[in-house]
Each structure stands twice: as structure tokens, then as C-alpha cells.
Amino acid sequence: MEMTVFRTKVQRAVSEALGEEYSVELREVQKNNGVILQGLMIRRAQENMMPTIYLNSFLKAYEEGATFADIIRKIVTVYREDAVGKQIDISFFTDFEKVKDRICFRLINRDKNRSFLEKVPYIPVLDLAACFYYAYDGNGVQNGMIPIYNNHMSAWNVTDRELFACAVKNTPRLFPCDIMPMESALEELLEELQADVRQHLAREIPMLILTNAGKTYGACCILYPKVLEQLAKRVDGDYYCLLYTSPSPRD
């Protein structure tokens, strides 16, 4: 089934399952590197929280044999477990003084995110872009992210450089870097191997992973003060840094 047909059927079925008290909308969501995901946004009357549930994995499950009724039940269950009854007061977001201490940055590819970068403030970093978000954590929402758009910057009457100055201070504080050997990151995959095999892999592939404590947007750690210097000391020489970013849809 084509996604355009599938998402329309899902929207109609979820709307019928929840009733007239709920608003169910379709939305295309642009992720990193030009990836477009199909989202279903659900909001109950009198609530201001409207989570997005991505449909791409549900279409795949349907094509692999899941019934359409099962798909709808799963979507409704995900919504009820995660969103019902939650209210977020976002009035604070109009006041720069109230948000400046949680403004952070992430790094994305400039060429692959041109259309997105037209809408947001950012600082060029080589072929990358440091763009900004508010790290929201409260009211039952953990590791939430509110992207900062050009209209926010205008309303706050600040510049992209001022946002960057805040983000450079906040991001390492809220999301400290974590440097680990590759084998530590792959420990679960390697634990079934014999000890001598693991040791051999560690010797033959002496790679390190640089990320942050939240394991999200870890590429930004290359801009943390003295982090690259720490890496040079740890490897005791020159090194190459391979950046990896990927969308993190709610599957």
C-alpha cells in the first residue's frame, strides 16, 4: 500500500476510534539530511500537547502481515500511554530570560538540510551547521526538544551569535561528553564472543566513540571546549573524526 493511501486510512480510523473530542492531523516532518517522515498528530480538546507518532514503521509492519486493526490499536495505545492528560505551559517560551539557560545546539549537514536551514538561525561550522533548540525536561516529558526558528529569534530580539554563546555554555553542562572505546559501545553485541576474540577486536580496531551523556546529537561534542585536545592526548597522536548523524523517529 502506498504511504499516501495508508496515512489517510490511518487518520480516519484513529479519528473514529478516539471520537469527536480528539483532533487527528497528518504532518510531514523533516528530519536530518533531508529525510521526510510521515507523522500523525493527535490532540484532545483543552490539551495543548500534540505529540507526533511516525507512521513509517507502522506501514512496514502492515506490509509484513500485521492487520490494519492491530495497527490502529497500537497507535491509540501509544498515544494514550504517552500523552493523555499532559499539559505543558509554554508561555515561558516568549521570554528569552526564561529560556536562555537551556538553549543548546546540535550539528547537521548544511548541504542536505538547506530547506530546514532557511527557517532557523544557525552558525556555519565547516560544511556543517550548528542550529539551536530548547532542551525541555519537565511535566513527565524527558529529553524533550523545542526547535528554535527565525521567528523565535526575532521575538526575543537576539542574534544568532547570542544564541550560540548561550548554547556553547549550556550544551556541555546539560549534555556532558562521553568518550568510550568502540568495544564498550558494542558490548552487548560482543558479549557472546569469547574473551580472546573481543581482545583481538579491541587491538585491531582501536576506535573511540565521542558522544554525550544523552546519546543524542553527540556530534556536537566536537565543539565542546578542549574535547578535541582531550582526544589527541588519549590517542597520543593525530586522528580522524568521523561524524555520524541519523534521524531518531518515534518508531
Predicted feature locations:
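Conserved small/polar residues in nucleotide/adenosyl-binding loops
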Residues: Y244-P249
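Hydrophobic, Leu/Ile/Phe/Ala-enriched alpha-helical segments that form helix-helix packing faces
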Residues: V10-L18, Y22, I75, Y79, ...
